[in-house]
Amino acid sequence: LNNVEMILSYLVGAAAFNFSYMTMVMVRMTRRLQAMLLQDSLTGLPNRRVIEARLKQEWRRWARHTAPFTVLAVDLDHFKQVNDTHGHLAGDEMLVQVGQRLLAGVREVDTVARTGGEEFLLLLPDTDAAAARAAAERVRASVGDEPFRVRGQSLRMTASIGVAQVGEGDADAAAVLARADAALYRAKGAGRNRVCGADAAPAEGAPAGSA
């Protein structure tokens, strides 16, 4: 009988241990999956899903309290030449370093995201037009003023930036983002390595959701 009790006790203990271990493994796997869904796999920055969710949050805050926010759309100029000339590993390394420089130049409350390829988005809460323009110029300088040390080589890069501050004519968060993108294309068309502000949103009354 004692042997049976010992065996049963062992089996129960082993089952409890295995359950605890499997639970721990599942928790870790869940966290990794969540990170994969929310982070850019190359740079570790938030991805488009994250910044669009935060943009919607800021939009709701604007609609309720008229709290200003600004979006910066950033695109690296002629980045394809880096990949074509130095290889994709060099391009990837430069993207990581660009992300680090962008993070170093903003506040903790700001969001820096890589949204694909050589494109980044920055969300700056509680930022008026003058502060937004200054922030955009700092971002541009952080990319272009100093060369990048990539795989033993010194490589130059510049960035074009579109700036859009939320306005009463914006129907939703996507409208602010669209104006930032349009300003970015104007910066590209005007010669690159520059900051362009978005056209003001056409006023159509109070922001949605302000009632």
Would you name each region that the model predicts?
Residues 35-53, 74-88, 96:
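Conserved nucleotide-binding and Mg2+-coordinating catalytic segments in signaling enzymes
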Residues 94, 121-138:
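Short helix/loop segment flanking the catalytic signature motif in cyclic-nucleotide metabolism enzymes
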Residues 104-109, 141-154, 165, 184-186:
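Short catalytic/binding micro-motifs of nucleotide second-messenger systems
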Residues 34-35, 48-68, 99-107, 125:
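Short regulatory alpha-helical coupling segments
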Residues 112-114:
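A short pre-motif secondary-structure segment
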Residues 1-28:
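Membrane-embedded alpha-helical segments, specifically the hydrophobic cores
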Residues 130-133, 151, 164-211:
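Catalytic-core segments of nucleotide cyclases and related cyclic-nucleotide turnover enzymes
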Residues 98-100, 131-148, 179-181:
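Alpha-helical scaffold within the catalytic cores of cyclic-nucleotide enzymes
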